Curated annotation (Swiss-Prot):
Catalyzed reactions per annotation: guanosine(37) in tRNA + S-adenosyl-L-methionine = N(1)-methylguanosine(37) in tRNA + S-adenosyl-L-homocysteine + H(+)
Self-association state and partner proteins as the record states: Homodimer.
Any one GO cellular component localisation term in the record: cytosol
Protein localization: Cytoplasm
Name of the protein in question: tRNA (guanine-N(1)-)-methyltransferase
Organism: Paracidovorax citrulli (strain AAC00-1)
InterPro entries given in the database record: Alpha/beta_knot_MTases (IPR029028), tRNA_m1G_MeTrfase_C_sf (IPR023148), tRNA_m1G_MeTrfase_TrmD (IPR002649), tRNA_m1G_MTases_N (IPR029026), tRNA_MeTrfase_TRMD/TRM10 (IPR016009)
Classification via SUPFAM superfamilies: alpha/beta knot
Keywords: Cytoplasm, Methyltransferase, S-adenosyl-L-methionine, Transferase, tRNA processing
EC number(s) reported in the record: 2.1.1.228
Length: 255
């Protein structure tokens, strides 16, 4: 899969691509990431890519023409058939919030062109003409789209086969369908006792069924406490059995 990133600051991605477990995906080309600076497609001695907004107001707006030239170069480099053009994704506060299901969809695809906006935003005429999808990380504003782009790339990369040390690691992530969309359970490691706090006995029992039941109960408890909407979604989807409901009934008196 291939992601082409349109950014005025490609250097921000250098440590990101070279660090952590997901670097394998980028180093091997399993996730091919290429960078395009719209300044390279701007005209004039100053290579200007932004200008003042019509109507006045603070800040600057990214100009449509350099972005379109940049996008045109990307399309030519990708050599895409008209019916298989990669979607252009722009990160914006008005976009759909990126979640696990969305990441899974991108991870199963062939990639995209990611537009990292800056300043007050992008000329709306370019957005209307070329942007296919708008995504957001949440109800807050960042200085640019680079951090959301990194978040999407990292989330997609770790779902690719062979990237994580344990192929099944992501199957036990929070929100995963394998966990019925619940949050993950607490985790413990050595020593068995730390500052007077012991590891839960179930995890030391060696009894796999008991361990799995404990983990399931903990997932239910954590999710009910922090994201009750996910519990209700699992219930509506028919993913909770009688044992789960019994655990939740006990929790209701404690939360």
């Amino acid at each position: 899969m291939r992601f082409d990133v349109i950014t005025l600051f490609p250097e921000l991605f250098t440590p990101f691509l070279a660090s952590g477990v997901t670097r394998r995906a980028y180093a091997t080309g399993l996730v091919d990431v290429r960078f395009w600076n719209p300044r390279d497609y701007a005209e004039g001695n100053y290579r200007r890519v932004d200008d003042r907004p019509f109507g006045g107001g603070p800040g600057m707006v990214m100009m449509a023409e350099p972005l379109e030239r940049c996008l045109r170069a990307i399309r030519a480099d990708r050599g895409e058939a008209p019916e298989a053009v990669a979607p252009l994704v722009m990160f914006s506060p008005i976009g759909r919030r990126l979640d696990h299901d969305g990441v899974a969809g991108w991870a199963a695809g062939n990639g995209a062109v990611l537009l990292c906006g800056r300043y007050e935003g992008v000329d709306q005429r370019f957005v209307d003409a070329h942007v296919d999808v708008q995504l957001s990380l949440g109800d807050f504003v960042l200085s640019g789209g680079e951090i959301p782009a990194m978040a999407l790339l990292d989330a997609v990369a770790r779902l690719q086969p062979g990237v994580l040390n344990d192929a099944g690691s992501h199957q036990e992530d929070s929100f995963n369908a394998a966990l019925d969309g619940l949050l993950d359970c607490p985790h413990y490691t050595r020593p068995e006792s730390w500052q007077g706090q012991a590891v839960p006995a179930a995890l030391l029992s060696g009894h796999h069924a008991q361990i799995e039941r404990w983990r399931r109960d903990q997932r239910l408890a954590v999710t009910a406490r922090h994201r009750p909407d996910l519990v209700e979604a699992a219930r509506v989807a028919g993913r909770l059995d009688r044992a789960d409901e019994a655990v939740l009934a006990k929790l209701n008196g404690l939360l």
